[in-house]
């Protein structure tokens, strides 16, 4: 009996993890740059992080001009929400995700308006 339960448990876990893997592949990454760029930067960001907003405002334009637009670098943005507001904003960012980073820049540019709730 223990052997049957163990086998069923292993089958169940294997089935559940394969379903999860298929779902995670359907998430379209927000990125900019050529797919075949030699360098890919993966940026883990929280949409309520002031440092991340500063990166999008002050560093990213130069990075885009000097490296991304020339096809040398590709940047991929991944959500790493640090609070519930960032989590909800990341869901908004994925809702109408065309794979481009415009929504990220819009959310970061208006971060001071939406990230802090009234207490």
Regions from the PLM with identified roles:
Residues 23-39:
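A short beta-strand-turn-helix
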Residues 45, 53-119:
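Structural alpha/beta surface segment adjacent to cysteine/selenocysteine redox centers
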Residues 7-16:
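Bacterial N-terminal signal peptides
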Residues 40, 45-48:
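Short pre-active-site segment immediately N-terminal to redox-active cysteine/selenocysteine motifs
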Residues 15-23:
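Bacterial Sec-dependent signal peptides at the C-terminal "C-region" and cleavage site
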Residues 1-4:
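Positively charged n-region of N-terminal signal peptides that target proteins for export
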């Amino acid at each position: 009996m223990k052997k049957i339960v163990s086998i069923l448990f292993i089958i169940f876990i294997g089935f559940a993890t394969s379903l999860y893997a298929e779902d995670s592949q359907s998430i379209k990454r927000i990125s900019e740059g050529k797919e075949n760029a030699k360098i890919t930067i993966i940026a883990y960001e929280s949409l309520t992080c002031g440092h991340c907003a500063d990166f999008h405002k002050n560093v990213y334009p130069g990075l885009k001009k000097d490296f991304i637009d020339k096809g040398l670098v590709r940047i991929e943005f991944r959500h790493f929400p640090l609070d519930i507001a960032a989590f909800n904003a990341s869901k908004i960012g994925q809702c109408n995700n065309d794979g481009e980073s415009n929504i990220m820049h819009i959310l970061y540019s208006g971060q001071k308006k939406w990230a802090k709730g009234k207490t």
